[in-house]
From Swiss-Prot:
The keyword GTP-binding does not apply. GO terms for molecular function: uracil DNA N-glycosylase activity. Excises uracil residues from the DNA which can arise as a result of misincorporation of dUMP residues by DNA polymerase or due to deamination of cytosine. It catalyses: Hydrolyzes single-stranded DNA or mismatched double-stranded DNA and polynucleotides, releasing free uracil. This is Uracil-DNA glycosylase. InterPro entries: UDG_fam1, Ura-DNA_Glyclase_AS, Uracil-DNA_glycosylase-like, Uracil-DNA_glycosylase-like_sf. Pfam families: UDG (PF03167). PANTHER family: URACIL-DNA GLYCOSYLASE. Belongs to the uracil-DNA glycosylase (UDG) superfamily. UNG family. NCBIfam families: PRK05254.1-1, PRK05254.1-2, PRK05254.1-4, PRK05254.1-5, ung. The gene is ung. Its EC number is 3.2.2.27. GO terms for biological process: base-excision repair, AP site formation via deaminated base removal. It comes from Bacillus cytotoxicus (strain DSM 22905 / CIP 110041 / 391-98 / NVH 391-98).
Amino acid sequence: MKKILKNDWEPILGPEFEKPYYQNLRQFLKEEYSMRVIYPNANDIFNALHYTSYEDTKVVILGQDPYHGPNQAHGLSFSVQPGVRVPPSLQNMYKELKADIGCEIPNHGYLVKWAEQGVLLLNTVLTVRQGEANSHKGKGWEQFTDRVIELLNEREKPVIFILWGRHAQAKKKRITNPNHYIIESVHPSPLSASRGFFGSKPFSKVNRFLSSIGEKEIDWQIPNL
């Protein structure tokens, strides 16, 4: 059978694709992609795992489900394709980045540079119908992405988990290994950012922790396109 994942996620996550829940999810997605507009493009569904391998993951930024507007989602949480307006939550992340560590605010929202440095930009649900937020909730993706979190939790080498908002914080119970570091606050959404996201300094906290364990810090500056 053709391998879905192209790096070190395949041997540890590959068995999920054979499980009944995933077979059901696959059938559901086949029908959805053939009958509706679904985001992201089917080839981009696993981009978070393709860009950031298991061993290279230093940080996890957990999102909910993909953006549901045209040309936005490309498989990385919070990130949008080049040429698309930066969504409000990401605008707030950029504002906090500037306040926290002085990063200039870029002219786009394409976060691949973070992913390539070991920031796993993972949504808990990996697909969505156009214009319908949470439309693929409860179809099996949660079980799959819970497994991703469990596999990272099993790792000896520390991982920093960034949990913004209640939805992400619900995953905290899966992070039981004391080696790991959890950063929590309200979500960067305009609805909640002023209640504790602004001023929470997550980006400098990440780099301080990485530095303390002898790991290379993340260069958070996204260059203009």
